[in-house]
Amino acid sequence: MSLKRSDDYQDLEEGIAMEDGGNIKDEEEKPLDPIEEQNKKRWVLIRAVLGELLCTFLFVYVLCATSANFIRLGSPPNPVVGGLSTGFAAVALIYSFADVSGAHFNPAVTFATCVTRKTSITKGLMYVGAQLVGSVLASLILLATFPGNFPGDKNAASAVAIAPSTDANIGNAFLTELVLTFILVYVIFAVAFDTVDNSVKTKVVGKSSSNNLTIYTTSGQTKAGFAPIAIGFTLGFLCFLGGSVSGGAFNPARVFGTALVGNNWTRHWMYWIADFLGAGLAGFAQKFFSSTHK
């Protein structure tokens, strides 16, 4: 969920902007030798992958712990509390990790960035691997922080595992996951990536004389600044939708760790295929509507 264009590596800074008497000037840095430059790029990638692992761990743990706490208290699931905790956690984590890894914490989001060529396949595979490790670690920590048996003689991980409703067929659940993931990824691509000219710092108003249609748009920088809030709100309201049908995952990392640790693989494949399909369609759809699309 990057707040900037998701290139394979950050470009190295070529100069340092320094203020001298109110004027800004560039001071050239000594070029790095090829080995040093390669090492720096490698470290940036390693840091990004580790950041994605930690970000996913925190996100999945918050969601699972919220559900586990309700179950231990004997309270029925509360979609409002679940939506708020999901949204707030997403906002905090995106602000915290956006400049480290891009804060995807969702294999479907990473897949969409790969198929739209915002992320390389190699980096995407490393991200997905890190996300799955983070998901498993979150489920293991959940067992340590919520001990004892849950209803149905389940452990904490299996108790909060997401699965389709028993009264919904596979088509209902598949389509629900696809649509919810499409909404999420479309919003992420629309607000988190540079879709307009960043050199435009102010709002642009265009008016068509033929039909009196006024179009308002904002700069990429303005949109990116509010991206964590927009994404958090989207995750929050999506929690109110589809939970009674598919379980409302729209994130394969949310279901993988609990499925592995809790040994609950009910229709697990659906959350990968439906979510990846919805994410890919959303990425291409947003690219089509983007102002930079040629």
Swiss-Prot record:
Record SUPFAM superfamilies: Aquaporin-like
Induction (record text): Inhibited by mercuric chloride.
Effect of D275P: Impermeable to water in Xenopus oocytes
Signal sequence, renumbered to the chain: none
Chain location of the short sequence motif NPA 2 per the record: 251-253
Site, Selectivity filter: residue positions: C239
Residue ranges of the region described as Disordered: 1-31
Outcome when changing D275A: Impermeable to water in Xenopus oocytes
Residues bearing glycans: S75
Membrane topology note: Multi-pass membrane protein
Localization: Cell membrane; Cytoplasmic vesicle
UniProt motif NPA 1: location: 106-108
Comp. bias intervals (Basic and acidic residues): 22-31
Free-text description of this protein's post-translational modifications in UniProt: Glycosylated and non-glycosylated forms exist throughout all developmental stages.
Side Extracellular, residues: 64-79, 145-172, 246-268
This protein's domain notes: Aquaporins contain two tandem repeats each containing three membrane-spanning domains and a pore-forming loop with the signature motif Asn-Pro-Ala (NPA).
Function, in words: Putatively gated water-specific channel, requiring a cysteine residue within the channel. Impermeable to water, glycerol and urea when expressed in Xenopus oocytes. Not regulated by pH; channels remain impermeable to water at pH 7.4 and 5.2.
Family the entry assigns: Belongs to the MIP/aquaporin (TC 1.A.8) family.
Name of the featured protein: Aquaporin-B
The organism of origin for this protein: Dictyostelium discoideum
